[in-house]
Amino acid sequence: ATYKVKLVTPQGQQEFDCPDDVYILDQAEEEGIDLPYSCRAGSCSSCAGKVKQGEVDQSDGSFLDDEQMEQGWVLTCVAFPTSDVVIETHKEEELTA
């Protein structure tokens, strides 16, 4: 399946289609969208965002605990969309504050 991903970035909103087996960060790069990242393995907070709407599967990640994920935190480098989704990006400072 393919889902609509809307990213709310400091530079404005970006929308694209993302297959359910492609990480959101990878697909964003394919679309020419510049997002922050570091490890690309779900073990740091550089790419952190907040899911505002919809669902993701980020079971490949290890940095976030269950409580953070329940609050909507997402690591875009290990997140697959499982529905149409809206994500606020560039949230590392807020997450680690």
Swiss-Prot record:
Residue numbers binding [2Fe-2S] cluster: 39, 44, 47, 77
Cofactor: [2Fe-2S] cluster
Ranges that cross the membrane: none
Major place of residence: plastid
CDD domains: fer2 (cd00207)
Subcellular location: Plastid, Chloroplast
SUPFAM superfamilies xrefs: 2Fe-2S ferredoxin-like (SSF54292)
Keywords for this protein: 2Fe-2S, Chloroplast, Electron transport, Iron, Iron-sulfur, Metal-binding, Plastid, Transport
PROSITE patterns linked: 2FE2S_FER_1, 2FE2S_FER_2
Family: Belongs to the 2Fe2S plant-type ferredoxin family.
Cited function: Ferredoxins are iron-sulfur proteins that transfer electrons in a wide variety of metabolic reactions.
Protein name: Ferredoxin-A
Source organism of the structure: Alocasia macrorrhizos (Giant taro)
